């Protein structure tokens, strides 16, 4: 949603100090009118900036500074497909911005393969390896770039944990009670 009114209602309903609640904001909201300003005013809650940054290394590096200092996310996503240099530049920028602002560095999470994609989609884009092999390769790049973790479907968690143990945190967006027809997740599991 891009509705600040709707987001404010959700936050008000979850402000109880008994709850450990975090809020995930994606491109749609953070790029909406006043979206980043609104998020920067949320205090004492965990912010997950799910922006999936993917651009040339210097552009991503420069984009990280204001995100870290203004939005102050606990977690921030980048596409591993941007390459090791882009990821390393992001780690550098997040570390520097955090030090200069005396704030905690966000966890930088690399997106492996979008959970809306399946093997057929990858083949249509010219990829010659499976999703599983792609996630394996991407998780190795994330580790080399010193990311804090990765984002993958729940179907690949065991693979990543077997490869990297607890070195990389693993975030899984594809958890659904059941398949919904208006949901764009292709690779998901039920709890």
Residue ranges of model-derived segments:
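Conserved anion-binding
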Residues: 59-148, 153-158, 163-167, 171, ...
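Conserved alpha/beta-domain cores
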Residues: 1-43, 47, 51, 57-65, ...
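Short glycine/threonine-rich catalytic loop with a Thr-x-Gly-x-Asp
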Residues: 182-188
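Basic, amphipathic alpha-helical patches used to engage nucleic acids or provide basic targeting signals
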Residues: 191
């Amino acid at each position: 949603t891009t509705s600040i009114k709707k987001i404010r209602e959700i936050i008000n309903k979850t402000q109880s100090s008994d709850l450990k609640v975090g809020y995930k904001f994606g491109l749609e909201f953070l790029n909406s009118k006043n979206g980043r300003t609104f998020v920067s005013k949320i205090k004492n809650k965990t912010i997950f900036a799910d922006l999936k940054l993917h651009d040339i290394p210097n552009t991503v590096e420069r984009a990280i500074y204001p995100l870290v200092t203004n939005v102050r996310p606990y977690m921030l996503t980048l596409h591993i497909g941007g390459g090791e240099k882009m990821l390393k530049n992001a780690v550098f920028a997040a570390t520097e911005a955090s030090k200069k602002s005396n704030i905690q560095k966000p966890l930088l999470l690399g997106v492996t393969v979008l959970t809306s994609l399946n093997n057929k989609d990858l083949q249509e884009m010219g990829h010659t390896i499976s999703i599983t092999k792609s996630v394996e390769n991407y998780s190795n790049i994330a580790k080399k770039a010193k990311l804090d973790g990765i984002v993958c479907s729940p179907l690949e968690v065991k693979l990543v944990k077997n490869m990297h143990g607890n070195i990389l945190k693993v975030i899984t967006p594809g958890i659904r009670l059941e398949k919904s027809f208006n949901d764009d997740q292709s690779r998901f599991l039920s709890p």
